[in-house]
C-alpha cells in the first residue's frame, strides 16, 4: 500500500490520443497501478496532455527510449553532444508542461540528467543518468546478472545469476549423458503389486 506502482504501456498502445486514453484507462483499472508511463517527448505532448486531462496520472521518458531503440542503431547513450542534450532537456520541459507527473531519465550523461532535474519540478527517476533524480532504477535482470552477453554500462551487477544458470544447465546435460539423471530419487515409482498387475495385463494382451 505504500509503494507507488508505475505501469509502462506497451509499444503501439498509445499511438493516438483516443487509443492512449482507452488503453491507459483499461490498464489502470485492471492493474491497480498508480500511474502509467509512455515513451514520448515534445513531438507527442498532445497524447500526454490527453491522458492527463482524462484524469490518469501519466509519466514519460527521456534520453534512451527502448521502444525507439531501432532508430538509434541499438541501446546507446543519448545526449553525448550538446545539441542532442538540449533536445532531451526540451523534451523533459515539454513533458512537464503537458501535465505529466514524472519523468524517467535513461542512458544520458550525468551532466545532462542534472540539468533535466534543474529544469523540471516533477518527480524524476534515473536509470543510467548518474546520481541525478529523485530515485534510482535498475532492471532486475541487469542487477542480478541475468545476462552474460548484454550488460548496459550503467548497470552494476550485484549478483551473477547468469553463471549460476549456465553451470546448472551444463550439469544437467552432463548427468543426462552419463545416465546419472534422472535417478530413483527424482523418479516416480509404482508399488511392486501394481507393477505385477501391469505386467500380467500386458502379457495377456501380447498373447492375443
Predicted segment positions?
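Alpha/beta enzyme core
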Residues: 1-208
Amino acid at each position: 500500500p505504500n509503494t507507488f506502482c508505475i505501469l509502462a504501456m506497451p509499444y503501439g498502445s498509445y499511438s493516438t490520443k483516443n487509443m492512449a486514453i482507452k488503453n491507459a484507462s483499461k490498464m489502470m483499472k485492471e492493474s491497480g497501478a498508480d500511474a502509467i508511463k509512455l515513451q514520448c517527448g515534445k513531438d507527442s505532448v498532445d497524447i500526454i496532455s490527453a491522458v492527463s486531462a482524462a484524469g490518469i496520472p501519466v509519466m514519460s521518458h527521456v534520453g534512451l527510449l527502448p521502444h525507439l531503440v531501432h532508430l538509434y542503431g541499438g541501446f546507446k547513450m543519448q545526449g553525448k553532444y550538446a545539441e542532442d542534450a538540449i533536445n532531451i532537456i526540451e523534451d523533459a520541459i515539454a513533458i512537464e508542461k503537458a501535465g505529466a507527473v514524472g519523468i524517467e531519465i535513461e542512458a544520458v550523461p550525468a551532466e545532462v540528467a542534472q540539468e533535466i532535474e534543474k529544469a523540471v519540478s516533477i518527480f524524476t527517476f534515473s536509470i543510467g543518468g548518474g546520481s541525478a533524480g529523485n530515485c534510482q532504477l535498475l532492471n532486475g535482470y541487469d542487477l542480478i546478472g541475468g545476462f552474460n552477453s548484454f550488460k548496459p554500462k550503467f548497470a552494476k551487477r550485484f549478483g551473477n545469476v547468469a553463471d549460476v544458470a549456465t553451470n546448472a544447465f551444463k550439469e544437467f546435460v552432463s548427468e543426462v549423458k552419463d545416465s546419472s539423471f534422472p535417478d530413483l530419487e527424482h523418479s516416480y515409482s509404482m508399488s511392486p503389486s501394481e507393477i505385477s498387475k501391469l505386467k500380467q495385463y500386458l502379457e495377456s494382451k501380447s498373447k492375443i
